[in-house]
Each structure stands twice: as structure tokens, then as C-alpha cells.
Amino acid sequence: WAYMGPQPAPLLPDWEAFSWDNGFTQVVLSEVPCNWFQCQENSIDPVHFEWMHENWGNRQRTGEVRFGATHLKLDFKEFEFGFTYHRVKQDTSEDDQAWTVGRVCLWPNGFFLGEHFEWRVPIDDENTLSVTWKYTRVPREREPYAQTHIPTWWGPVKDEHGRWIDTHVMNQDFLAWVGQGRIADRSRENLSASDRGIVAMRRRFFEEMDTVAQGGEPKAILRDAERNVRVP
């Protein structure tokens, strides 16, 4: 971790997942040639999963045209450290964790999906460093397991022939981000009801920029050490 802002530095959040035991953790880095903000907007766009990872992904794997379960219900909520999105699809119900818990879009550039974090770190206006922190629980027969170090490796975005890799969920996301151009032209977009989370996030960014310009502290800054304790 590196902090490059003004002093005093805020606390690094001690998210619960950082303390999970009996698992293997690794960090995967990839350089993505587009602006970081369009990457982060993808974090609060649940319906892209249906089309990118299920419909298109299924066709990539099998060659067959098979459509995944359609989204029936969506909700977006803001909380102290970001936003959550919640969904019900044709193959789930409101008892499913996808609705009761949802997924977490961490402010300002993170995403938590239950077993891994993703961060979109700006390199410059047209390039982003994708950082994935992935936890995998070891088999029960291997417990207790203590990991002594966390390996870090670079994940390629193109194969040896220069073709974009599209066989993994993260790489499919990279394609969606880069396909919008180096900097997405939002003057040509057509937002719909499923984009309410994107709209809410954009509004919050403008509000927080105004707050900082006026000398205030932005959203999700943590300074109280007594609050910076993982949920047991």
C-alpha cells in the first residue's frame, strides 16, 4: 500500500477479509488502456453480468446461443463506505444473498465480491492499473493453514498473437472497459433504469469534489482507530 495524499494520512481500512485464515491469498495486476472511472462504473452495473459474462460468455465457451437468467428486480443503496447493488434474477429469489446482501462498490475505486477485492488505480488519464486481491479457502483436510507471504503476479490482457484474452471474467470486464475507448464519450450514451447506480455514483463524485474544493473531507475517510476493527 502507498499513501500519496496530504497529511495526516487516514487509516487503511481493516476489512474483514484481510483477516480470514485457512486460505490462500494472491494479488493479480493488469494494466488496462483506458480511464479508471469507466472501469469503476462497471462495478455498479449489475446487468452487464447477464450480457457480458452469461450470454456472451456462454457463446464464447460453447459456440451455442444460450441466454442466461434475466434480471427481474434491482436496487441500489448508498452507505458510509460506498454503494451496494442488489438483484433478483429469474433463477433466484429475494431470499438469495444477491438480494439480501448484494455486492459492494467501495468508495472511491474498489469493488468487493465476497471472496475478492478489485481496485481500479489511475496511472494517467488513459491507463489504469487493475489490482485484484483474491482469497481461496483451502480444503478442510489442509487446515490449519498459515500463509507466510502473498504472491503477486501480472495477468496478461492479450495472448501471444496480440488478441485480447476473453476466457476469464476479469478479462471480459477489461474488454468492456476498453471497448468504450480510452476515455468514454458519455455525451453519446443512453442510460436506462438499470443504470441508476451509475447515475448515483457520478452525482456523489461531483458532490465530493465540491466538498474537497471547499476544504472538507471526502466520503469514506477513516480516522478513528476504535472504529477500524474488522467485523467478527
Where are these regions (language model features)?
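C-terminal catalytic domain of Rieske-type non-heme iron oxygenases
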Residues: 1-232
